[in-house]
């Protein structure tokens, strides 16, 4: 297992559209395991492969408090969505920044699990929001893309300043 480097804005690799996984094999399972290690090390609740410079349609999520409810979504497809909600979202690729983002309240998706088995999942609340957030990453979209240009610029400047401070430390 390994902790991978998480890309931060303004890194353009975050805008690359992920490719479908052709076969779930040992390499894909290793990527999934490394992504969980990375997500937990960074204290996140979700991570898309794009965020660790792997441009495959892979997402890992764990919104549980005890960190024991791992959800793997390989090649996820949105089947249905309904309702409206929104919370202040954060993102490991946009450290220490949050903003209110409009999302569907409920979603139904189809995906492959860590073993390559197809399944469908209906989600609501935080899990539904997290799924939508991570699926956005797979198409090169970030939560700040939902914000006004002024708010986007302010967040970019704050993240760049944080990265400069971390580099000096």
Swiss-Prot record:
Entry cofactors: Fe(2+)
GO function term, MF aspect, one: metal ion binding
Entry keyword Protein biosynthesis: yes
Gene3D superfamilies in the cross-refs: Peptide deformylase
Highest taxon in the source lineage: Bacteria
Reactions that this protein is recorded to catalyse: N-terminal N-formyl-L-methionyl-[peptide] + H2O = N-terminal L-methionyl-[peptide] + formate
SUPFAM superfamilies: Peptide deformylase
Cofactor note as given: Binds 1 Fe(2+) ion.
Residues involved in Fe cation binding: 91, 133, 137
Record's function text: Removes the formyl group from the N-terminal Met of newly synthesized proteins. Requires at least a dipeptide for an efficient rate of reaction. N-terminal L-methionine is a prerequisite for activity but the enzyme has broad specificity at other positions.
Assigned protein family: Belongs to the polypeptide deformylase family.
Name under which the protein is recorded: Peptide deformylase
Species in which this protein is naturally found: Enterobacter sp. (strain 638)
Organism taxonomic ancestry: Bacteria, Pseudomonadati, Pseudomonadota, Gammaproteobacteria, Enterobacterales
